[in-house]
Every structure is written in C-alpha cells, then in structure tokens.
Amino acid sequence: MAKPSYVKFEVPKELAEKALQAVEIARDTGKIRKGTNETTKAVERGQAKLVIIAEDVDPEEIVAHLPPLCEEKEIPYIYVPSKKELGAAAGIEVAAASVAIIEPGKARDLVEEIAMKVRELMK
C-alpha cells in the first residue's frame, strides 16, 4: 500500500518504536497532548518538543496540515505506522492520529535523539 501524501519521509521501524517509547515515558513522567486538535494547538503555541503522527489516518486531511505546520515552527515530527499503537502509547483506549510531547520528563534524551535522527531523514 502506498504511503499517504502527508508522509514526507520513511521512518525506520526501530526509530518509530523509539518514538512510541518516548510517548509512553513522557506520558508517565512529563506532559503530552493527545489527538490532532490538542497537537495542533501545542505546535501553534510552540510548546511541542516532538510531534508523532500516525501513518494510517483516514481521511488524510485530519493530519495533513501537521507536517508543514511543524516545519514552519521548526518542531521535529516523526511518523509511526499505527494510530492504534499511538493511542495505546498515549495511554488511551482509542486510536490517536497524532500526539505532541510537551514536556519529555525522563524521555528528554530519547526525544533529543529522535529529533536529531529525524532532521537527518528530512535532508
């Protein structure tokens, strides 16, 4: 299956797994925003340290605005394969199209590592 139009770069599986791990750690020791509306607000306000976007969002328009918005605000973003997995990592029982890490807590080093690798992928 072809990647949706909003997916601008390929994310290695292990990096996507690290992103989900960072969401779980930040959920427990820091602060996250769940869902596209909350994520969009966090990006617009410049609060997000890392944005995680699911690749299987339908319709695409729900999250299509996030990559250009993150680029404009210079906030790193990454894709994960499943909105269900992203929701679970965020601690909710439903799927999440996107999540923003506001305060990484104990995931600070992991978030910085992911952000650095994402910048390399985007080149």
Curated annotation (Swiss-Prot):
Optimum temperature is 72-76 degrees Celsius for RNase P reconstituted with this protein as well as protein subunits Rnp1-4. Pfam families: Ribosomal_L7Ae (PF01248). One of its GO terms (cellular component) is cytoplasm. Disulfide bonds: none annotated. It is found in: Cytoplasm. GO terms for molecular function: ribonuclease P activity; rRNA binding; structural constituent of ribosome. The keyword tRNA processing applies. InterPro entries: eL8/uL1-like, Ribosomal_eL30-like_sf, Ribosomal_eL8-like_CS, Ribosomal_eL8/eL30/eS12/Gad45, Ribosomal_eL8/Nhp2, Ribosomal_eL8_arc. Keywords: Cytoplasm, Ribonucleoprotein, Ribosomal protein, RNA-binding, rRNA-binding, tRNA processing. The keyword Oxidoreductase does not apply. Signal peptide: none annotated. Its main location: cytoplasm. GO terms for biological process: ribosome biogenesis; translation; tRNA 5'-leader removal. It comes from the Archaea. Part of the 50S ribosomal subunit. May be part of the RNase P complex. Reconstituted enzyme missing individual protein subunits is suboptimally active, showing each subunit contributes to optimization of activity. Multifunctional RNA-binding protein that recognizes the K-turn motif in ribosomal RNA, box H/ACA, box C/D and box C'/D' sRNAs. When added to reconstituted ribonuclease P (RNase P) it increases the optimum temperature to that of the partially purified enzyme and causes a 5-fold increase in apparent Vmax. Binds the RNase P catalytic RNA. PANTHER family: RIBOSOMAL PROTEIN L7AE FAMILY MEMBER (PTHR23105). NCBIfam families: eL8_ribo. Belongs to the eukaryotic ribosomal protein eL8 family. This is Large ribosomal subunit protein eL8. It comes from Pyrococcus horikoshii (strain ATCC 700860 / DSM 12428 / JCM 9974 / NBRC 100139 / OT-3).
